[in-house]
Each structure stands twice: as structure tokens, then as C-alpha cells.
Regions:
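Flexible, solvent-exposed loop/hinge segments and secondary-structure transition points
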Residues: 2-191
Length: 191
């Protein structure tokens, strides 16, 4: 009996030490991760709208919980450039966070901020071939780089509905389409 209690005590001590180590590491890295995320978002905003001014732009609220951030993008003179949506969704294959630029009820550009899908490279290729996307490889997070610049113009709601999601990662492609539609519908005022 004493032996079992001793083993249980040692295991409890090990688990407490591990928990403290994990919590400490989280405290050290959480600020760095947040700063890197903000830097990536700013870089993406500036890639979409080259004259984007973070200080003049207005962060807005949205009732849709998939929209994690909504910004009315403005230039340094306060002129409106369009809306920037950070939209997040998840399915059985992982999470996707994209930034969607909308102006005049059309999608101007779609960029990945996070692509955690199990077939991430296929989803990335599909998005780059189906939606307006940046030719700048550095905007895309992760190891998946665009092979050729997309010349797709802005897309209306009906054009987005017509995008074929059958690819090597159909569930990821459907999730991206759903997220783009969420942003577009919010920009249209839920119409």
C-alpha cells in the first residue's frame, strides 16, 4: 500500500512540474505569438490595399461569430478603401483563417492567414486558382507558395456561388467558399 502511495505521489509531482513548465512556456511565448499574428495581419492588409493606414482605419463589430475581425480600411487621408474581414472556420480536417477584402459588394482578394487543413497545399492551390489572390508569395503563411500569379478580377456573389469546390480537398474548398460568403454577406448588410 505504501509503495502505491509513493508511486502516486511521484507521478503527481511529475505532473505538477510538467504543468508548471507548460504554463511558463505559454506565458513566455503568448506575447510573441500575438505580435507575430498582428504583424502578419498588417502585412496582409498592406498587400491587399497598398495605401492602407492602420491608424486611420476603423475596427468594426459583426454579429457573425465566424468573423473575428472587421475593419473599414482607409488610407492616410481617411479615404475608404474597402472592408477587410478576418474570418475563421473549422471542419474535421482543421481550421482555416482567411482575410477577405470586399469593396462595392464584390470580393477583391482572399488571403490565407492560417491554413491548418490536412490537405493544406491543395486548398491553397484551389483558392489561388479560384479567387482573386496576391501574387506576392510572402503574404501566404506556411510552406505553400503560389506558382503563378492569379489574374482573377473581383467576384460578385453569383460568381462565388459558381466556383467549383471539387478538388483534392473538397471539404477545405467548401469551408473557404463558406467563409468568403460570410464576409461578403456581412459587407452587403446581411442581404
Amino acid at each position: 500500500m505504501k509503495r502505491n502511495l509513493k508511486i502516486a505521489g511521484v507521478l503527481a509531482l511529475i505532473s505538477v512540474i510538467c504543468a508548471l513548465a507548460i504554463a511558463g512556456m505559454n506565458m513566455v511565448t503568448s506575447g510573441i505569438i500575438k505580435a507575430n499574428t498582428e504583424k502578419t495581419e498588417l502585412k496582409t492588409c498592406q498587400a491587399i490595399f497598398s495605401s492602407y493606414d492602420k491608424d486611420k482605419s476603423e475596427e468594426m463589430t459583426s454579429s457573425n461569430e465566424a468573423i473575428t475581425k472587421k475593419v473599414l480600411a482607409k488610407d492616410s487621408n481617411g479615404n475608404e478603401l474597402g472592408y477587410l474581414y478576418t474570418v475563421t472556420g473549422k471542419n474535421a480536417y482543421g481550421a482555416i483563417t482567411i482575410m477577405v477584402a470586399v469593396k462595392d459588394d464584390k470580393v477583391l482578394q482572399v488571403e490565407f492567414l492560417e491554413n491548418g487543413q490536412s490537405f493544406a497545399s491543395t486548398v491553397t492551390s484551389h483558392v489561388q486558382n479560384s479567387y482573386p489572390s496576391s501574387p506576392d508569395d510572402s503574404v501566404h503563411v506556411g510552406a505553400y507558395k503560389k506558382e503563378e500569379a492569379s489574374n482573377i478580377g473581383s467576384l460578385s456573389s453569383s460568381e462565388i456561388d459558381g466556383i467549383d469546390t471539387a478538388c483534392g480537398a473538397t471539404y477545405g474548398a467548401k469551408l473557404v467558399k463558406e467563409l468568403v460568403n460570410i464576409a461578403l454577406q456581412d459587407a452587403k448588410g446581411g442581404k
